[in-house]
């Protein structure tokens, strides 16, 4: 807890020039600029510390003992605090009031907080794209991001012998982090064939920044003799109370086993998806990206959404990596300052920023093109998913039930399928199963969804609250009367 | 009592980093001060934290970023605390909820 604020009996109300949701690279970049220009800024994050995913802070004891893996994150946070931004950690923003502009949050003691601002900046980041397989709900099966956080900020290993699987460039740095801690990485299963003819060839492509970074990870993995199985996917995970082996298959024939590997942890992810629920709840227009099947807010160059008082920045506005996230945060800050008539950005700086963002976008497109697109992945993985696979982890809904319902009573409609089966209705709000459920529905009703024109692309709608809210918060928000009645 | 020292090799050794003691299901557990509760539990290889309310099968941390709710435990009497976005402090009392029905055949 950093900011001074009293917990009012019910519904503390905060009014600011700017409220920023999300304290990752994007939100922090915006906050530093806006607060140092003199605006009253509040930045909220549900995590106990600012930093978001990329700048997740190690505990001080870890940093002292093993070093800080990303000291620039610490400096950016210090800059935000020094500039006078009010930093509210442990604050979950879970909804929007009926007026369409008041954010509803709960603080670290579960007290309700209402926030209003002339400008709202949504910097809620991304979450990992996962796809189910039999046994993915076993303890010891995680996302690669979890393994990365354990290694980088908690200096803890996810397992002793680990397989990483899924797709995308992120698997490589995670494998490197694990190796550094002495974990045996038994192999990396990559669904695509991005590394041609070999991993090392990446370095010769001559593209700076992201590809060179990838090449350096690749070199480290080669030195550690970590095999990379390309065009390979997870067929299933086995184990009693915890994962003990993983069976892999060729991506082209995802039902036929090719290799079983003993592991004590398995980390599977297919990149990231933007977290757009608050933007949608605020009535901002979103479009569905046909290639990924993800909802992406419609924004102008500076991140301005279809509502003029709302900005969406960072990975919440589309996946692009940390540099793009920071550039988008800054661009939004500059746009707000210009509208406020404060310290307009010099033309030369604005031009530099524009070209930097274009360059970043090109790199993202380039790296993306190396890996299979999410829609293509779904088309191969969804039809092959065994009938009894638990697809919705929260509500324990299996593939067969989703297929039967989608083809039957739901008539190919994603939301009807959700309502009938309860898939996507649990506490994670479909963030973990949404991608797969959409794919399953589409696989039995190929006439619907992606590939059939944008108007027919379907995703789960945003629902209030974005995360389960403690009952105590709701009672307090409703006022003393409701609590009396309850007692 | 289990100590992190005893797990060196299974997880990166704690070295000289300051340790804190917390209590997990009645067991005293030593871990590096201020790391995430999920890290302490996974470092101890205590993966199972709860049972799925529908299927009854054991679950453990999955996303590590507050999204999946698979890491919910009770902390100092407060239920539904996500271990992955909670830092440990001295004397923290943690209860998992792994008792109960074994899962039906799967
Ligand atoms: C688990 C994980 C690990 C990652 N690790 C790496 C890595 O090692 N290297 C790399 O290059 N990229 C990594 N990424 C990609 C990463 O998303 C970007 O590089 C970068 O962090 C994006 O910055 P951002 O500011 O857009 O969002 P984020 O850094 O994701 O920050 C968003 C913040 O918003 C907060 N938030 C979201 N919704 C709410 C809400 N409703 N109420 C309150 N707070 C909220 C979150 O707690 C989070 O702190 C990782 C992503 C994930 C999901
Ligand atoms: S591991 Fe997913 S919420 Fe904690």
What are these regions (language model features)?
Chain A
Residues 2-421, 425-427, 431-487:
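Residues forming the flavin
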């Amino acid at each position: 807890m950093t900011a001074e604020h009293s917990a009012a009996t019910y519904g503390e109300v905060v009014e600011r020039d700017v409220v920023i949701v999300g304290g990752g690279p994007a939100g922090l970049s915006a906050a530093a600029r806006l607060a140092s220009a003199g605006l009253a800024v509040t930045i909220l994050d549900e995590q106990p510390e600012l930093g978001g995913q990329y700048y997740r802070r190690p505990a001080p004891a870890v940093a002292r003992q093993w070093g800080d893996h990303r000291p620039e994150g610490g400096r950016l946070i210090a800059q935000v605090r020094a500039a006078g931004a009010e930093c509210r950690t442990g604050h979950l923003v879970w909804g929007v009031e009926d007026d369409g502009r008041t954010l509803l949050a709960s603080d670290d003691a579960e007290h309700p907080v209402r926030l209003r601002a002339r400008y709202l900046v949504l910097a809620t980041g991304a979450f990992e794209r996962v796809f189910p397989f039999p046994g993915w709900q076993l303890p010891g099966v995680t996302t690669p991001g979890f393994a990365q956080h354990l290694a980088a900020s908690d200096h803890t290993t996810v397992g002793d012998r680990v397989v990483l699987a899924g797709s995308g460039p992120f698997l490589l740095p995670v494998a490197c982090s694990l190796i550094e801690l002495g974990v045996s990485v038994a192999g990396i299963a990559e669904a695509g064939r991005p590394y041609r003819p070999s991993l090392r060839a990446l370095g010769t492509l001559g593209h700076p920044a992201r590809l060179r970074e990838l090449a350096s990870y690749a070199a480290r993995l080669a030195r550690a003799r970590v095999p990379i199985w390309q065009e390979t996917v997870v067929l299933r995970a086995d184990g009693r109370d915890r994962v003990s082996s993983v069976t892999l298959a060729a991506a082209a024939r995802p039902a036929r086993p090719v290799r079983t590997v003993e592991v004590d942890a398995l980390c599977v992810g297919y990149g990231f998806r933007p977290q757009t629920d608050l933007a949608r709840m605020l009535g901002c227009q979103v479009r569905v990206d046909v290639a990924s099947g993800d909802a992406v807010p419609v924004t102008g160059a500076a991140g301005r959404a279809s509502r003029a008082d709302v900005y969406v920045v960072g990975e919440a506005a589309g996946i692009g990596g940390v540099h793009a996230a920071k550039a988008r945060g800054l661009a939004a800050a500059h746009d707000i300052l210009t509208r406020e008539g404060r310290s307009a950005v010099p033309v030369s700086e604005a031009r530099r920023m524009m070209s930097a963002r274009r360059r970043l976008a090109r790199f993202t497109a380039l790296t993306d093109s190396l890996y299979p697109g999410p829609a293509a992945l779904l088309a191969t993985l969804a039809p092959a998913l065994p009938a009894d696979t638990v697809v919705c982890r929260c509500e324990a809904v299996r593939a067969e039930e989703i297929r039967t319902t989608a083809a039957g009573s739901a008539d190919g409609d994603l939301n009807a399928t959700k309502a009938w089966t309860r898939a996507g209705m649990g506490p994670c709000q479909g963030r973990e199963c949404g991608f797969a459920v959409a794919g399953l529905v589409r696989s039995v009703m190929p006439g619907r969804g992606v590939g059939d024109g944008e108007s027919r692309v379907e995703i789960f709608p945003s629902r209030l609250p974005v995360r389960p809210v403690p009952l105590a918060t709701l009672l307090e928000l409703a006022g003393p009367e409701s609590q009396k009645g309850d007692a | 009592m289990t100590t992190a020292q005893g797990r060196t090799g299974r997880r990166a050794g704690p070295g000289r980093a300051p340790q804190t003691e917390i209590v997990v299901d009645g067991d005293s557990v030593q871990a590096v001060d201020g790391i995430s509760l999920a890290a302490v539990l996974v470092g101890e290889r205590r993966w199972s934290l709860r049972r799925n309310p529908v299927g009854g099968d054991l679950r453990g941390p999955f996303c590590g970023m507050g999204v999946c709710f698979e890491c919910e435990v009770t902390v100092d009497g407060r239920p539904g605390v996500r271990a992955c976005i909670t830092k440990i402090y001295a004397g923290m009392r943690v209860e998992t909820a792994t008792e109960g029905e074994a899962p039906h055949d799967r």
